[in-house]
Amino acid sequence: IIYDXVGQCDKDFYRPELPR
């Protein structure tokens, strides 16, 4: 499951430009 860094974000899919 991949989220836009919201709630739960995959470490490999994490984007610094998006809120955590």
UniProtKB/Swiss-Prot annotation:
Name listed for the protein in its UniProt record: Unknown protein from 2D-PAGE of needles
Please tell me what else the database record remarks about this protein.
On the 2D-gel the determined pI of this unknown protein is: 5.6, its MW is: 36 kDa.
What cystine linkages occur within this chain? none
Q: Which organism is it from?
A: Pinus pinaster
- Domain of life here? Eukaryota
